[in-house]
């Protein structure tokens, strides 16, 4: 299993895809996806474009649905939900399809949607991701951070490191790029205080300015949800069933 870390979707190679792509947007899209599916949502369907989400939802008739939209850290007008994972309670989302668009995470999913296997990771479901990769043993794994509008993000990188640390056997042949070691090192330095790191991160600072420390604390928890979101068709994620 060869591991690669890419800090943003723009940093990924354009002429190839991995056997398995792991998309990460800890603050907050992939945390919200994991939380929604763990709470019983039928699926999460992602849209990079807000207009596309509204147009699609107007014709959708197969299952009950909720629209979840976020831009700049705030809920989009006309959507029932924003991008707060804490809104995804069983009472709210069970049996429903979540139509989701966010500033960064949905763009990262779009970049790798043609890979044979696409899963999403966050701190909350880290161990489920590790177990899946240890079992499936894909030849190449890309950890794709969502970043913030094309820029590096601490929280996505440290999550990639948290997963890669459990997969790396110490053999240099497993390292696809230097970013893997950087991510693992960041996790080793901050693993006892991820909440503190997230508050220092630029997107954590944005959420703090929006008076949303509680979401940061939620997203900084590790291994609290036994759920693995996996793409079943382009843009559609469901809970993986063994």
Swiss-Prot record:
Classification lineage: Bacteria, Bacillati, Cyanobacteriota, Cyanophyceae, Oscillatoriophycideae
Cofactor: Mg(2+)
Molecular-function GO terms, alphabetical: 2-phosphosulfolactate phosphatase activity; magnesium ion binding; sulfopyruvate decarboxylase activity
EC code: 3.1.3.71
A matching Pfam family: 2-ph_phosp
Family statement: Belongs to the ComB family.
Listed name of the protein: Probable 2-phosphosulfolactate phosphatase
Stored InterPro entries: ComB-like (IPR005238), ComB-like_sf (IPR036702)
Catalysed conversion reaction: (2R)-O-phospho-3-sulfolactate + H2O = (2R)-3-sulfolactate + phosphate
Annotated gene: comB
Keywords carried by this UniProt record: Hydrolase, Magnesium
């Amino acid at each position: 299993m060869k591991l690669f870390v890419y800090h943003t979707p723009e940093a990924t190679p354009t002429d190839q895809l991995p056997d398995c792509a792991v998309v990460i947007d800890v603050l907050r899209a992939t945390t919200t996806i994991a939380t929604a599916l763990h709470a019983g949502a039928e699926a999460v369907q992602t849209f990079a474009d807000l207009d596309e989400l509204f147009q699609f939802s107007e014709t959708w008739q197969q299952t009950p649905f909720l629209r979840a939209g976020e831009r700049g850290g705030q809920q989009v007008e006309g959507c029932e939900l924003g991008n707060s994972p804490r809104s995804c309670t069983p009472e709210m989302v069970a049996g429903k399809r979540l139509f989701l668009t966010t500033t960064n995470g949905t763009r990262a999913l779009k970049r790798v949607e043609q890979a044979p296997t696409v899963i999403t990771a966050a701190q909350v479901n880290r161990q489920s991701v590790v177990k899946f990769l240890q079992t499936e043993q894909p030849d190449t794994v890309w950890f794709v951070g969502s970043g913030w509008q094309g820029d590096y993000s601490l929280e996505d990188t440290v999550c990639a490191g948290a997963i890669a640390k459990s997969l790396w056997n110490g053999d240099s042949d497993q390292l696809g790029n230097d970013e893997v070691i950087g991510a693992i090192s960041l996790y080793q330095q901050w693993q006892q205080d991820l909440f503190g790191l997230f508050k220092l991160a630029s997107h954590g600072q944005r959420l703090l300015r929006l008076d949303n420390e509680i979401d940061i604390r939620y997203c900084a928890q590790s291994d609290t949800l036994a759920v693995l979101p996996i793409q079943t068709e382009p843009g559609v994620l469901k809970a993986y069933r063994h």
